[in-house]
UniProtKB/Swiss-Prot annotation:
Residues 351-447 form a coiled coil. GO terms for cellular component: Cdc73/Paf1 complex. Component of the PAF1 complex, which at least consists of cdc73, paf1, leo1, ctr9 and rtf1. The PAF1 complex interacts with PHF5A. Residues 506-520 have a biased composition (Low complexity). Component of the PAF1 complex (PAF1C) which has multiple functions during transcription by RNA polymerase II. PAF1C associates with RNA polymerase II, is involved in transcriptional elongation and in histone modifications including methylation on histone H3 'Lys-4' (H3K4me3). Residues 375-386, 417-436, 448-477 have a biased composition (Acidic residues). Keywords: Coiled coil, Nucleus, Transcription, Transcription regulation. PANTHER family: RNA POLYMERASE II-ASSOCIATED FACTOR 1 HOMOLOG. Belongs to the PAF1 family. It comes from Xenopus tropicalis. This is RNA polymerase II-associated factor 1 homolog. It is found in: Nucleus.
Length: 520
């Protein structure tokens, strides 16, 4: 067979065909795959994308907590670089004739306030006390505000205040002189107002304790909103509120609340008739009051923590000004009636007057004695006697032996008197504690009543639509030993408070039980 000669072109064609020959991909599965679903080729050309992360985040050095907590030793010289000469004292002596440097002289110059050049800076320099500083929002006030306070001025003022605020009533003589000065100042005529020079007094009246009405305890009743009825006008509403009463009640669940009673039309006519005839009440008349509102109550008195004394003034024409104490503060807030709980919406308070019993008269006399009490002066006399006895004992010790024995007897007598005085003080403290407890109980009794008057009530009275019965015996203490206090009337409010027509009531509620109450 003749040899076959392969030319260069044929050689290139054969190489080209072999290069395009595809090699089947080997499957990773041992067995033959019958159905295969290979991914299609990417339809886009490859391109470069910017790497958004920091390339040093994997190689950046971070100190560990061990390195952070390590404390390095600070090696310094013992004298901290300051050489102190302990031998020659003239080293640190200052020459008074030395001239200061120009830079140091500027530090000793007084600070002179430069005049403001712009109106805006003048406006920002003003301090308005009723506006809130916006220091956290804007720094304009700090940039334009000119401070008139200097450290030197502050130092001087603080030293001066220390002398003025110093307690000058430490010894007995200074206290006596200060008390006598108050009487001298009270005798000086009042020519003008203490802070308003153009205001002059029209009338000057003395102020005294109200000895006449002090026997009756007064309370301040604060409402969260106007308790006046909505359907009444201004003058009629004031007349009704001047005769109103508050009374403690209880709902079906046993929750206590305060009811606000307003007089009816018939009761208003009776009270107006009594006022025209100059009577406090008619003995046989019955006064009806209908419930208007329900309140939750909060009482504070002298026995309560954080109690602040409160007084009110009564102006009596031609007589002067008298002050009285409000020893109880009652704060009333509107009460929400729960669903399904029946309240005393239609309750009627029936008031009938009676004379005061012996316990009430004794309580009035106790309050009068409390106002007229002069125990502090008696204690001062006891202290003066003890001091004189002590001085006599010292003089006796300087004398003969018999005088020393007499002084010893006097000292023993003074010691026994001191022990008696201490016992009396303890008894007074116990009496004060018991009086505070009695006052708290009396305040609760004023709102929720007591069971002392059960025997005075003959029978229950008919109430409103729901058949509730409530009766009351109203006690008056003005004139014939009776008074009444209206729940909404204030010391300055109605004509009844100025004329001192105040009723002290004891009312029945529920099944005809009689409970005493003072409503203010």
């Amino acid at each position: 067979m003749a040899p076959t000669i392969q030319t260069q072109a044929q050689r290139e064609d054969g190489h080209r065909s072999s290069s395009h020959r595809t090699v089947p991909e080997r499957s990773g599965v041992v067995c033959r795959v019958k159905y295969c679903n290979t991914l299609p080729d990417i339809p886009f050309d490859p391109k470069f994308i910017t790497y958004p992360f920091d390339q040093n985040r994997f190689v950046q050095y971070k100190a560990t907590s061990l390195e952070k907590q390590h404390k390095h030793d600070l090696l310094t010289e013992p004298d901290l670089g300051v050489t102190i000469d302990l031998i020659n004292p003239d080293t640190y002596r200052i020459d008074p004739n030395v001239t200061l440097d120009i830079a140091d002289e500027k530090l000793l110059e007084e600070e002179i306030q430069a005049p403001s050049s712009s109106k805006r800076s003048q406006q920002h320099a003003k301090v308005v006390p009723w506006m809130r500083k916006t220091e956290y929002i804007s720094t304009e006030f700090n940039r334009y505000g000119v401070s008139n306070e200097k450290p030197e001025v502050k130092i001087g003022v603080s030293v001066k205040q220390q002398f003025t605020e110093e307690d000058i009533y430490k010894d007995r003589d200074s206290q006596i002189s200060a008390i006598e000065k108050t009487f001298e100042d009270a005798q000086k005529p009042i020519s003008q107002h203490y802070s308003k020079p153009r205001v002059t007094p029209v009338e000057v009246m003395p102020v005294f304790p109200d000895f006449k009405m002090w026997i009756n305890p007064c309370a301040q009743v604060i409402f969260d909103s106007d308790p006046a009825p909505k359907d009444a006008s201004g003058s009629a509403a004031l007349d009704m509120m001047s005769q109103a009463m508050i009374r403690g009640m209880m709902d079906e669940e046993g929750n206590q609340f305060v009811a606000y009673f307003l007089p009816g039309e018939e009761t208003m006519r009776k009270r107006k008739r009594d006022q025209e005839e100059g009577l406090d009440y008619m003995p046989e008349d019955i006064y009806d009051y209908k419930i208007a509102r329900e309140y939750n109550w909060n009482v504070k008195n002298k026995a309560s923590k954080g109690y602040e004394e409160n007084y009110f003034f009564i102006f009596r024409e031609g007589d002067g000004v008298y002050y009285n104490e409000l020893e109880t503060r009652v704060r009333l807030s509107k009460r929400r009636v729960k669903a399904g709980v029946q309240s005393g919406t239609n309750a009627v308070l029936v008031v009938k007057h009676r004379d005061m019993h012996e316990k009430e008269l004794e309580a009035q006399e106790a309050r009068r004695a409390q106002l007229e009490n002069h125990e502090p002066e008696e204690e001062e006399e006891i202290e003066v006697d003890q001091e004189t006895q002590g001085s006599d004992a010292e003089d006796g010790e300087k004398g003969s032996g018999s005088e020393k024995e007499g002084s010893g007897a006097e000292q023993s007598g003074s010691e026994s008197e001191r022990e008696e005085a201490e016992e009396e003080e303890k008894e007074d403290e116990e009496e004060k504690e018991s009086s505070e407890e009695d006052r708290a109980a009396r305040d609760k009794e004023e709102i929720f009543g007591s069971d002392d008057d059960d025997s005075d009530e003959d029978g229950p009275n008919e109430s409103g639509q729901d058949g509730e019965d409530s009766g009351s015996d109203d006690e008056e203490e003005k004139g014939q030993g009776r008074r009444s206090r209206s729940a909404s009337s204030s010391p300055f409010g109605s004509d009844h408070s100025q004329q001192e027509n105040e009723d002290q009531s004891a009312s029945d509620q529920g099944s005809g039980s009689s409970t005493g109450s003072d409503s203010d």
